Amino acid sequence: MAKRNIRIMGDSILNKTSKVIEEVTPKIDTLIDDMLDTMYDAGGVGLAAPQVGVLKRLVVIDVSLEGNEPIILINPEIISTDGEQTGDEGCLSLPGKAGIVTRPNYVKVKAYDRHMKPFEVEGEGLLARAFCHEIDHLDGILYVEKVNGEVHEVTSYDEEEEE
């Protein structure tokens, strides 16, 4: 397992559509582990394969406080949504920035696990937002295309405490 470089907005790979994964090869298995390492190291709650330069329909998400409940989604599809939430959204591919985005408050996704077994998973709040955000990446869509208003600078809690 290893950390991979996160592609930054402006890299053309982030605007391309990812390809379906037909089988989990050893290379894909390693990619899953590397993406988890990369996401946790960067302090993110989700990461899509294009963000590490791979045009495959693969997403990893973990919104748990402890960072120990990873959700691996291969070929994910949103099958239902409900409600609405509006809030700040950021992205590891656009560090130090955030913007107000409206997303569904409830999302149900069908996908395959790392053994290519189909499953469904649902989430509300932050998890629903993460599902939408990461699946958008697989279709070459960045959250900045959905921002209400302007993208703004994000100050970390550490910087605020020093002031």
Curated annotation (Swiss-Prot):
Keywords: Hydrolase, Iron, Metal-binding, Protein biosynthesis. Gene3D superfamilies: Peptide deformylase. InterPro entries: Peptide_deformylase, Peptide_deformylase_sf. The active site is at residue 134. Its EC number is 3.5.1.88. It catalyses: N-terminal N-formyl-L-methionyl-[peptide] + H2O = N-terminal L-methionyl-[peptide] + formate. Its cofactor is Fe(2+). Binds 1 Fe(2+) ion. One of its GO terms (molecular function) is peptide deformylase activity. Fe cation binds at residues 91, 133, 137. It comes from the Bacteria. One of its GO terms (biological process) is translation. Belongs to the polypeptide deformylase family. NCBIfam families: pept_deformyl, PRK00150.1-3. Removes the formyl group from the N-terminal Met of newly synthesized proteins. Requires at least a dipeptide for an efficient rate of reaction. N-terminal L-methionine is a prerequisite for activity but the enzyme has broad specificity at other positions. This is Peptide deformylase. It comes from Lachnoclostridium phytofermentans (strain ATCC 700394 / DSM 18823 / ISDg). The gene is def.
